[in-house]
A protein has these predicted regions:
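Hydrophobic transmembrane alpha-helical segments in integral membrane proteins
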Residues: 1-21, 129-136
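Short, amphipathic, aromatic/basic-enriched membrane-interface segments that mark the entry/exit
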Residues: 4-13, 34-38, 65-66
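Hydrophobic cores of alpha-helical transmembrane segments in multi-pass inner/ER membrane proteins
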Residues: 16-24, 74-83, 135-150
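C-terminal membrane-adjacent module
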Residues: 102-168
Length: 168
């Protein structure tokens, strides 16, 4: 992979929380608490992953526990979002889209674990390092979808002048 691409990916992977901070602020201001909860939980899990990643890599010299912890973290995020979706604490459509985006992450983590210890495939590193940032980008986009829906809804509502009955 080109060095500029790897540098770009490293910058993005370290700043997911900062990329979601405007969404948290906007959803709180607009009192869209369903979207706020979704984004806040996602920020919490990105923050947890950012804090524990370096110590987990340092602790795990045999490359087993890191993938299990990361897969478990993704599954726990999915379970919490699904529970909140059922209990109407987050938008159900956002919950479903989030599940569909993130389902690839634990699968990739476990694939990477099995590959490192059993298969030793040459191309799995490329698949892993390429798809994981796209999954994270997709998750960030899902967090911003209610904002896009809000602005689309506001632009489709007619103004008072347009909706007034015609004058005689």
């Amino acid at each position: 992979m080109p060095d500029w691409f790897l540098y770009f990916v490293s910058i993005l992977s370290k700043s997911w929380v900062f990329m979601l901070s405007p969404a948290l602020f906007i959803f709180f201001i607009f009192k869209d608490y369903l979207a706020f909860r979704f984004a806040l939980l996602t920020v919490a899990f990105f923050f947890f992953g950012g804090i524990t990643a370096s110590s987990l890599r340092e602790f795990d010299g045999i490359y087993i526990y890191r993938y299990l912890v990361w897969a478990a973290t993704d599954i726990i995020w999915m379970a919490l979002i699904a529970y909140w979706g059922i209990k109407d604490k987050v938008y159900l459509w956002q919950c479903v889209i989030g599940q569909l985006v993130v389902i690839g992450a634990p699968i990739l983590q476990l694939f990477r674990l099995v590959d490192r210890h059993l298969w030793d495939l040459a191309y799995s590193t490329i698949i892993y390092k390429t798809l994981m940032p796209f999954i994270n980008i997709g998750t960030v986009i899902v967090c911003y979808l209610p904002l896009i829906m809000l602005f689309a809804k506001k632009s489709n509502t007619p103004s008072k002048i347009e909706s007034a009955p015609p004058s005689k």
